[in-house]
């Protein structure tokens, strides 16, 4: 899967789940499960409920994603 296949969307974190998983509500209204990308994990970026985030989705599974950015 190339970088051009990835779908980027904005959303809001609703809930922090175990194992660094988060429930995120996208701007379209859909709710997905998302995990933190490696760069956010390495730099100890804290993500809390209510944070605005950018999520990458695979076209193969639109119910799971990867959090790549937390808005300031």
UniProtKB/Swiss-Prot annotation:
Database matches in Gene3D superfamilies: Nucleic acid-binding proteins
Keyword rRNA-binding (UniProt): yes
Keyword RNA-binding recorded: yes
Principal subcellular localisation of the protein: cytoplasm
InterPro entries: NA-bd_OB-fold, RNA-binding_domain_S1_IF1, S1_domain, TIF_IF1
GO cellular component terms attached to this protein's record: cytosol
Protein's cellular compartments: Cytoplasm
GO molecular function, one term: translation initiation factor activity
Record-annotated disulphide pairs: none
Occurrences of domain S1-like (ranges): 1-72
Subunit-level organization: Component of the 30S ribosomal translation pre-initiation complex which assembles on the 30S ribosome in the order IF-2 and IF-3, IF-1 and N-formylmethionyl-tRNA(fMet); mRNA recruitment can occur at any time during PIC assembly.
PANTHER family: TRANSLATION INITIATION FACTOR IF-1, CHLOROPLASTIC (PTHR33370:SF1)
Entry function: One of the essential components for the initiation of protein synthesis. Stabilizes the binding of IF-2 and IF-3 on the 30S subunit to which N-formylmethionyl-tRNA(fMet) subsequently binds. Helps modulate mRNA selection, yielding the 30S pre-initiation complex (PIC). Upon addition of the 50S ribosomal subunit IF-1, IF-2 and IF-3 are released leaving the mature 70S translation initiation complex.
Protein name listed in UniProt: Translation initiation factor IF-1
């Amino acid at each position: 899967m190339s970088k051009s296949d990835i779908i980027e969307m904005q959303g809001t974190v609703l809930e922090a789940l175990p194992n660094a998983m988060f429930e995120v509500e996208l701007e379209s209204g859909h709710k997905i499960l998302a995990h933190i990308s490696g760069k956010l994990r390495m730099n100890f970026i804290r993500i809390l409920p209510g944070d605005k985030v950018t999520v990458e989705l695979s076209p193969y599974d639109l119910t799971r994603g990867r959090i790549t950015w937390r808005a300031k």
